[in-house]
Amino acid sequence: MRTEYCGQLNLSHVGQSVTLCGWVNRRRDLGGLIFIDMRDREGIVQVFFDPDHKAAFEQASELRNEFCIQITGTVRARPDSQINKDMSTGEVEIFANTLNIINRSEPLPLDSNQINSEEQRLKYRYLDLRRPEMADRLKSRAKITSFVRRFMDDHGFLDIETPMLTKATPEGARDYLVPSRVHKGKFYALPQSPQLFKQLLMMSGFDRYYQIVKCFRDEDLRADRQPEFTQIDVETSFMSADQVREVMEKLVRELWQETKGVDLGDFPVMTFAEAMRRYGSDKPDLRNPLELVDVASLVKDVEFKVFSGPANDAKGRVAALRVPGGAQLSRKQIDEYGQFVGIYGAKGLAWLKVNDRAAGLEGVQSPIAKFLSSEVLDAILVATQAESGDILFFGADSYKIVTDAMGALRLKVGRDLELTRLGTWAPLWVVDFPMFEDDSEGGLTAMHHPFTAPKDMSPEQLAAAPTTAIANAYDMVINGYEVGGGSVRIHRTEMQQTVFGILGITEDEQREKFGFLLDALKFGTPPHAGLAFGLDRLVMLLTGTDNIRDVIAFPKTTAAACLMTDAPSFANPASLQELSISVVAKKGTTDAGAEENQ
């Protein structure tokens, strides 16, 4: 039906007859001529209709925005005075000979001249995707996945599919369950990741695997998360953690060079402990120059118990955040920051303005200055490298509250005061995570997942001191986003059983949930390691949006709903009966749908 795409026409096509298919982006009548901007997936070109071609001209008078049309015409060079440098096709236009109105359009429920609500955009997603900026993001996504496949193929990785219907295994989030009609009362689970299957592929001898795969997690959503998401999943045998990181860093560096023309350079490597200490986050945004400085040792003996209490508590922390030029902040702004850190459990935010660095106590302004001696103040100013015109913020509480609150404050202040270097890239690797962390019930949970190997520990040593164990794990972080994470896996049965035991999984539960894995580990399992990238998040970064829904064709809302199809919906009662499932409404509700499905 077409010979060319609208957005690909240029001066090399002048004089040629072309047939185009697409949509009317805009129509205007000027001096007896009808002009339209015609759009397809590759861009927009100007088409004009002359009364000398009567049939086409009369039809063109009927055109409205978003009519689907086909035109045939001759490519002409625009006069110099009419060249549109804002369009890739701005040097040419099409003199239309024939017009075929393929399909008419009703007035759109989305207004291209104003900002539409996200709910409206998601409800009419097929129309929202016609917008050039949305189409460009999906085209970029296609190019990115194509590049990844070429890279992985060139480096000897095999693209192998793993099952979508599998067994529920604890991986940190709730599973999406699928009932079995054949096996009454039993359920499949949609995979949270292909983790165990890719490990089994290593045991099968496929020493370099990758897959661009859908994953599913029933968890509370944020702007950068979806219930179904896409991973670039990778696993290797006979490669160390350093070697895996080297290949994956090469992939990302070449991807940035290909898509952005940017050389990211070698990625710095930072331990988890250093990242938390300096930046209050295990995914630090290094574009932001602000850092936390521990000052507990300097305030242990001050009379201000808000400081001295945590400073003398092994589980406490006192940290300062120096903000260059921050002395200009108003009291109202400072109070707002105090309210902000309260979100993270902080009971307040102490502050100190350095008006004159050389004047000691006389040169600072702060409600806490009266509790500080000249010696303590000078030690704090030296430790934080404070200068005249700066402000210091202090967090003092438990280690977790201070780290979380001051880390979040660091990011907010960096944005508010325009200290964060927007338009730049700051990648790094974070390594040496704790193997375990405390859970809400007083036990331990795996910080990554229960198949991660510890660094330099035997099963006996791990069982004796699990909270001291360091995981052989690594995360790739770019501009404060964790874009990928991986680890060296456990490849011996005894170590895997030890980890399960530390996590409170009984031997019977181990056999029930992971018997197939424990059996496989007995048969010459090679050492193996891997990593998974969040494709959606990578595309989000590369296309310059901060909303992951912008890079997914048909995303869900933060309530895990599809406004376009109205999913999830109530099931047909006959289908539920066939599955031997009964849906019961909660007490106190009058859910008609649930009653229908009982």
Curated annotation (Swiss-Prot):
Xref: Pfam families: GAD, tRNA-synt_2, tRNA_anti-codon
Location in or out of the cell: Cytoplasm
Start and end residues of each stretch annotated as Aspartate: 195-198
Binding locations of L-aspartate: E171, R217, H448, R489
Main location (coarse class): cytoplasm
Swiss-Prot/TrEMBL keywords: Aminoacyl-tRNA synthetase, ATP-binding, Cytoplasm, Ligase, Nucleotide-binding, Protein biosynthesis
GO terms under biological process: aspartyl-tRNA aminoacylation
Binding site for ATP: R217, D218, E219, Q226, E482, G534, L535, D536, R537
Subunit and partners: Homodimer.
Similarity remark: Belongs to the class-II aminoacyl-tRNA synthetase family. Type 1 subfamily.
HAMAP family assigned: Asp_tRNA_synth_type1
Protein's name in the database: Aspartate--tRNA ligase
